[in-house]
A protein has these predicted regions:
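Solvent-exposed loop/turn and edge beta-strand elements of beta-rich ligand-binding domains
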Residues: 1-209
């Protein structure tokens, strides 16, 4: 008997090292007995996010004109997500092989998460961020940005999920970055900043501090 589960991507999900418990109980009865057998198993499912900050060197750019694509480098698919405007967060909903059907991520331009592209619900894997549009007068990011997320349980089997796990880790363009917490769960988000100037683009890794 096998079973599968899907982790919804929304505010109820725990991102980072705390993980999401996935418990299953199987109860069955043999025809020649009067009692039931029960088997219980549990595992933790981990999911992560990207916290991208977009900046213009002169602070005059229009975030609404900026678009990014997010692609899974391992399986060669584009990420699809739905924006929760009140939270200023994109929650992953699926994926597609067609670029035309991919979500184009824009930085928030209101009071919530201003200048940020916050994407939650990513599995541990390698991703490619491509800037496909920017405000008039600014140059597109010339090179893609690679984000690698390594899960805290990548070497741990489900039956021993209860033991202490190593913290998740991340790299941006091959350089280690310190993942940030989310609602008390550490190693939840990969921070990076992209700054566009009118003459050239300067990607920066890591967060503020």
């Amino acid at each position: 008997i096998t079973y599968a589960c899907t982790v919804n991507s929304d505010a109820a999900v725990v991102y980072g090292d705390s993980g999401n418990p996935n418990d299953v109980t199987l109860t069955w009865k043999r025809t020649n007995t009067e009692y039931y057998d029960t088997l219980t198993d549990d595992c933790h499912v981990y999911t992560y996010g990207i916290d991208l900050t977009k900046e213009f060197s002169d602070n005059n750019g229009n975030f609404d004109n900026v678009k990014f694509l997010l692609k899974n480098a391992t399986d060669n698919y584009f990420v699809q997500a739905e924006l929760n405007k009140s939270e200023g967060i994109y929650y992953v909903t699926g994926h597609t092989e067609k670029e035309a059907d991919a979500t184009k991520f824009s930085p928030m331009s209101g009071e919530v998460n201003h200048g940020k592209v916050m994407v939650k619900g990513l599995e541990d894997d390698s991703y490619i961020i491509t800037e496909v549009a920017t405000d008039a007068g600014y140059t597109l990011l010339k090179e893609n940005i690679t984000v690698d997320i390594v899960s805290s349980d990548s070497t741990t089997i489900c039956s021993v999920c209860g033991k202490a796990l190593k913290t998740a880790s991340a790299k941006v363009n091959g350089k280690d970055v310190a993942m940030t917490e989310d609602n008390g769960s550490v190693s939840a988000l990969v921070p990076l900043t992209i700054t566009n100037t009118r003459g050239f683009d300067l990607p920066k890794t890591g967060g503020r501090g």
